[in-house]
Amino acid sequence: MTTNLFRKELEVLKPYVPGKPIEEVQKEYGIDQIEKLASNENPLGPSPKAVEAIMREVQHINIYPDAYAMKLKEEIAKRTNLTHENIITGNGGEQIIQLIAQTFINPGDEAIMADTTFGLYETSVLNMKGVPVILPLKDYKHDLDGFVEKINENTKIIYICNPNNPVGNILSKEEMEGFVARVPENVVIVLDEAYYDYAKVNPEYPESLDVLAKRPNTVILRTFSKVGGIAGVRVGYALTSKEIASQMSKVKDVFNVNILAQAAALGVLEDTEHIEKTVKLNYESLGMMEKYCEENDLEYIKSNANFMFMNIGTHSKPVFEELMKQGIIIRPGFLWKWDNWIRVSTGTLEQTEKFIDKLDGILNKGTCCCG
């Protein structure tokens, strides 16, 4: 095949590796019952009001959706004290991340980010011929001092995932305020708050809308995939200045949020009961995993997301594989070059107990050859 057929940027791009699908594990290992604790999904399932909204709307799928998702934007605006002009909706948070890069990055522009964070930041920047400037975590957190030191005339964006995926911890109000004050106004700060609804119960979690109010060159990213439980229909959104939203709208697909997704997202916004139950269960599941780690002297990162990052003291790959054989799917840390760590999504109490039991059997009873 002709070597110059494809764009040069593709040579450095790596496809995103999602968590293993349940069906694939069932087929590979011949297991019927699988507990998927790999992709940070809602163990309670979708919001019932989202399901009802989809069922009402399904008879209209012959009609194109509202290209502007105006009703959804207006409902989000009410809850954030913004206007619909401050909001961009997308086909999941991933599309918003792509839109950000497409809006801001020129060839040679730099974007600062952590080495252990959501991988699509780097991919989206590379795709636009930008230059990712990648710094290691410091004390398991974004190295904010290092970020500031790396700012130069080519810096266009700084990405902050808060809580950070896959680690799960947060930057505090004090840390965020001190950082934002040192970033020049012409640098765009992207605050990825995919796990916002879990984190906001922590009084130390910063209010990103205050950041946006003080500096317009801020983009806040949120999603309906997590507490809303509608990851399968794909809806995310950005809160930003009217000017930035206007520019982002120029590069988005016309009908980028389908009619069922818009209905589902509106249902989630109304379903406070489902959200409250989800958050409550989340911290109960985290508590069970914390207790196990403490009783077994396993290091873990205090999480304000719907997953835990823990050091199992041995390489994660054989543990990951053995857990799959026993019907549990998690994310092995070697994917992020954290060889001895695993990321485990929160689940129902039964799922969490099953995971703990299987992990304990592997680590303490030699079920796998962990080396």
From Swiss-Prot:
Its cofactor is pyridoxal 5'-phosphate. The keyword Nuclease does not apply. SUPFAM superfamilies: PLP-dependent transferases. One of its GO terms (biological process) is L-histidine biosynthetic process. InterPro entries: Aminotransferase_I/II_large (IPR004839), HisP_aminotrans (IPR005861), HistidinolP_aminotransfase (IPR050106), PyrdxlP-dep_Trfase (IPR015424), PyrdxlP-dep_Trfase_major (IPR015421), PyrdxlP-dep_Trfase_small (IPR015422). It catalyses: L-histidinol phosphate + 2-oxoglutarate = 3-(imidazol-4-yl)-2-oxopropyl phosphate + L-glutamate. The modification N6-(pyridoxal phosphate)lysine is found at K226. Gene3D superfamilies: Aspartate Aminotransferase, domain 1, Type I PLP-dependent aspartate aminotransferase-like (Major domain). Its EC number is 2.6.1.9. It is an enzyme of class 2 (transferase). Pathway: Amino-acid biosynthesis; L-histidine biosynthesis; L-histidine from 5-phospho-alpha-D-ribose 1-diphosphate: step 7/9. GO terms for molecular function: histidinol-phosphate transaminase activity; pyridoxal phosphate binding. Homodimer. Belongs to the class-II pyridoxal-phosphate-dependent aminotransferase family. Histidinol-phosphate aminotransferase subfamily. This is Histidinol-phosphate aminotransferase. It comes from Alkaliphilus oremlandii (strain OhILAs) (Clostridium oremlandii (strain OhILAs)). The gene is hisC.
